[in-house]
Amino acid sequence: MTNNLKPGERLDDLQIKGYEIIQSPGRFCFGMDAVLLSAFAKVKAGECVLDLGTGTGILPILLAAKTKGKHFTGLEIQEESADMACRSVRHNRLEEQIDIVTGDIKEASQIFGKGSMDVITTNPPYMIGGHGMANPESAKAIARHEVLCTLEDIIRESARILKAGGRFYMVHRPFRLAEILTAMCEAKLEPKRMRLVYPYVDKEPDRKSVV
């Protein structure tokens, strides 16, 4: 597989089922938030899962390894990241379980159809667009800042795509909790469970998961 890596890419061991993922340090590599979200999300046998803003496909791969879900789809707007995700899926021989789609989150309900998914996961950009960006068009800026989509876009499209009784899982930062709850209320998604994550016992929580 290393012969198929493009310049600047590396193959990282995911420490589960022998799966590996292609990443590029020059772009945006997954962090602990994606791992935490994969542990927080509950996927039942036979369910279909959509990951919005999948990046290099870390969440579909981890959820395929950890759960008995029927099928996993990752939506990613950046073509280079989507290409790495596709190659990681092939490398792990997960083509029958995982699809990677290149597309815009703002058009997700048009791409997949309303009421089509049992579960939606997302590890979205945390920062409001325009704050502290050296280059707003860089891959890292797009992953970290709301350049191409907003929190409201993600929640609105998720509400449209979920089946009745479906579940929405998101990891985000505590400082935007009020916005998250407001957007979920407007989209008629009712928060049921929240987990605060403390980096150290004597520190404030720096991220949270919401369903």
Residue ranges and their predicted role:
Residues 22, 99-101, 192-195:
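General small-molecule cofactor/ligand-binding pocket signal
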Residues 38, 136-139, 186-187:
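Glycine-rich, phosphate-binding/catalytic loops in enzymes
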Residues 148-205:
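Conserved Class I SAM-dependent methyltransferase catalytic core
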